[in-house]
Amino acid sequence: MRNHDCPTVRFFKARVYKEKETQMTQTKKAKVRNLIIAAMLTALGILIPMMMPVKLIIGPASFTLAAHVPVMAAMFFSPLMTAFVALGTTLGFMISIPVPTIWLRALMHLPVMTVGAYVLKKYPEFVHQKVKIQIFNFILGIFHAGLETLVVYAFYSLGFANIEQGALLNFLLLIALGGLVHSMIDFNLALGLGNVLSKAFPIDIFDKAKNLVNKKKVKAEI
């Protein structure tokens, strides 16, 4: 004998199906949105080194204001987007500045910023905690500047270019200290930009942080 669902069961099945369909549509829209944002940030990452007027070049070292902002902004979306934009910004430096050590330094954004994006994904609440986000910023800056210093040291130590020992030491100190300050300034620019834009547009890490804050408020009220 064939079983027929009662109207109530059919209603709930239709409702569940509609909710699943809505979730799938939202997921597809989010993927398309993130792809567009990744492309825009990558374009900015290429243009900033080429067009930014605030740029300091000392020998083989280069410090361009806001050069890290696109890849750091991508950290507030996902590790995958961060990696994609990091490669794009490296291309930007390769096009605009014909200095191999600068290319290598730019390439170091790939591991450092991607790991940073994973940390923010795990602890999204950091973006609303002023002390913790600056501690994160400082640690990120240390690894960022440290890895860039290490790769430049390896470049000269392996004989790809010649430089006097004293000049090399000064150069490495410049990259380490200047890179740390540069990284922290650019991260705060990216954080401020993300904080403002999150009020008008969905940004993954800021949305997760907001949800966590709301859950804590509900628990506190209970």
From Swiss-Prot:
Keywords on record: Cell membrane, Membrane, Transmembrane, Transmembrane helix, Transport
- Membrane spanning stretches: 34-54, 72-94, 101-120, 135-155, 167-187
User: What's its membrane topology?
Assistant: Multi-pass membrane protein
- Where in or outside the cell is it found? Cell membrane
Instruction: Report the main location listed first in the record.
Output: membrane
Q: Which GO terms describe its molecular function?
A: ATPase-coupled transmembrane transporter activity
Q: Name one GO cellular component term.
A: plasma membrane
According to its UniProt entry, what is the function of this protein?
Probably a niacin-binding protein that interacts with the energy-coupling factor (ECF) ABC-transporter complex. Unlike classic ABC transporters this ECF transporter provides the energy necessary to transport a number of different substrates. The substrates themselves are bound by transmembrane, not extracytoplasmic soluble proteins. Uptake of niacin into proteosomes containing EcfA1A2T and Niax has been demonstrated. Uptake requires hydrolyzable Mg-ATP and is substrate-specific; NiaX-containing proteosomes did not transport riboflavin.
The subunit structure is: In L.lactis forms a stable complex with EcfA, EcfA' and EcfT. In E.coli forms a stable energy-coupling factor (ECF) transporter complex composed of 2 membrane-embedded substrate-binding proteins (S component), 2 ATP-binding proteins (A and A' components) and 2 transmembrane proteins (T component), probably with a stoichiometry of 2:1:1:2. May be able to interact with more than 1 S component at a time.
Q: Which family does it belong to?
A: Belongs to the vitamin uptake transporter (VUT/ECF) (TC 2.A.88) family.
Q: What is this protein called?
A: Niacin transporter NiaX
Q: Which organism is it from?
A: Lactococcus lactis subsp. cremoris (strain MG1363)
